[in-house]
């Protein structure tokens, strides 16, 4: 099969990391994989595993970017995807326009809700898909509540990761020595970690409240 993923850019982030990981897995299974984005630090990793990247300036939400639907349509004609996987709201709108100029036998469209999107009308583009992926039960219930979609089309699929790179094993002795050399104040302390960007909706406020209640001599 030929699978194309669509997102604003390939900077370092969870959505972007998942895009690259899925693309690599698809190529290992013998599928043809492509990604459309404005580029970024993870772009080279696509070519490393044999995927194709189409560069399109769709990272900024403006009128010039929405006009890229014509160029996106040409990419579709060139790559001939069987499945289009949209991962962000603004590119999803561009996708809606691009598909209008294609023949009646259009690709299957899959969208992934990566969070609790605000502005329901603007986010409605993510519901214009044959099937929808929700990354958690909370997100799935949010989609049911805020979007007029058939529940059978919304599938709960938890976010996966490359367990070779993101593993739960203890760090090596060399890594630990390097850490304590750089942060000696953490020696003999229990370390708590909240992976992810520093943003409110990822629970950073709750994490800070937790830290304030702990014994600072131990943590």
What does each of the following model-derived ranges do?
Residues 76, 103-137, 141:
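A conserved, positively charged/aromatic
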């Amino acid at each position: 099969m030929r699978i194309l993923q669509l997102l604003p850019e390939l900077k370092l982030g969870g959505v972007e990391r998942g895009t690259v990981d899925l693309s690599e897995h698809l190529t290992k299974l013998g599928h043809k994989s492509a990604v459309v984005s404005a580029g970024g630090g993870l772009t080279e990793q696509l070519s490393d595993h044999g995927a194709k990247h189409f560069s399109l300036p769709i990272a900024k939400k403006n009128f010039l970017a929405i006009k890229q639907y014509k160029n996106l349509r040409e990419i579709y004609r060139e790559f001939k995807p069987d499945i289009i996987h949209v991962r962000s709201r603004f590119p999803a709108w561009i996708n809606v326009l691009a598909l209008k100029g294609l023949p009646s036998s259009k690709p299957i469209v899959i969208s992934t809700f990566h969070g609790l999107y605000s502005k329901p009308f603007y986010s409605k583009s993510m519901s214009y898909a044959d099937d929808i992926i929700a990354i958690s039960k909370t997100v799935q219930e949010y989609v049911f509540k805020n979007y007029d979609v058939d529940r059978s089309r919304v599938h709960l699929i938890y976010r996966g990761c490359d367990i070779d790179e993101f593993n739960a094993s203890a760090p090596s002795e060399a890594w630990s020595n390097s850490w304590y050399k750089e942060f000696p104040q953490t020696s003999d302390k229990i370390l708590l970690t909240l992976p992810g960007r520093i943003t409110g909706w990822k629970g950073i406020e709750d994490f800070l409240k937790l830290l304030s209640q702990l014994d600072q001599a131990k943590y």
